[in-house]
Regions:
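Short, structured beta-strand/loop micro-motifs enriched in basic residues and often containing a Trp
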Residues: 82-91
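Conserved, well-structured core segments that form or line functional sites
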Residues: 79-82, 97, 104, 113-114
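Flexible glycine-rich active-site/ligand-binding loops centered on an Asp-His dyad
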Residues: 111-153
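Single conserved hydrophobic/aromatic residue that forms the stacking wall/gate
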Residues: 1-9, 13
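Exposed beta-sheet edge/beta-hairpin loop segments within beta-rich domains
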Residues: 93-103, 131-136
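A short mixed-secondary-structure module that forms the rim of ligand-binding clefts
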Residues: 20-73, 82
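Short beta-strand/strand-turn micro-motif
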Residues: 15-23, 107-109, 145
């Protein structure tokens, strides 16, 4: 992470990125690669960025950053500047992907696979109703990403 921080100071600040909290996902091994998987609803501002780019980053903040989590999980980057609002300090990798100085751990990832969750594929209809019935929003899109780089404090 420190290498990325030093590099960021030499580079132009990128002006278009977003951050959000994501509770649904995991890390594992697939297709002989270290992977992560995340689920994002199409209504989210972050979804636009995921669709436009081949890479994404996952940053893990500690408990001391609860206020940052609260803002990033409740407000949209369409309406506020989350970096300004939270005090997050963006740093950029050599590939130009954004990480945050406050993160204890960050994963730089390349998209491998993406597909929408489909109602007809649910084997457990209770989960379908619980998470997608009523006013919950659209069906998530699942992204499987290869973990290319790991940065830690």
């Amino acid at each position: 992470l420190h290498k990325a921080i030093r590099r960021q100071r030499q580079m132009c600040i990128r002006d278009r990125f977003n951050t959000m909290t994501a509770s649904w996902g995991g890390i594992g091994w697939l297709w002989n690669k270290p992977v992560a998987f995340v689920f994002i609803r199409p209504e989210r501002y972050t979804y636009e960025f995921l669709e436009e780019n081949d890479h994404l980053t996952l940053s893990f903040l500690g408990e001391e950053n609860k206020k940052i989590h609260a803002v990033c999980g409740s407000k949209s980057g369409r309406n506020i500047d989350k970096v300004k609002e939270t005090g997050l300090k963006p740093v950029f990798t050599e590939k130009g992907n954004v990480l945050f100085e406050q993160a204890r751990l960050s994963l730089e990832c390349k998209k491998l696979y993406a597909d929408a969750i489909k109602p007809e594929c649910f084997l457990d209809k209770e989960s379908l109703e619980k998470w997608y019935g009523g006013a919950h929003g659209g069906f998530h899109k699942m992204y499987i990403v290869e973990i290319e780089n790991i940065y830690s404090e």
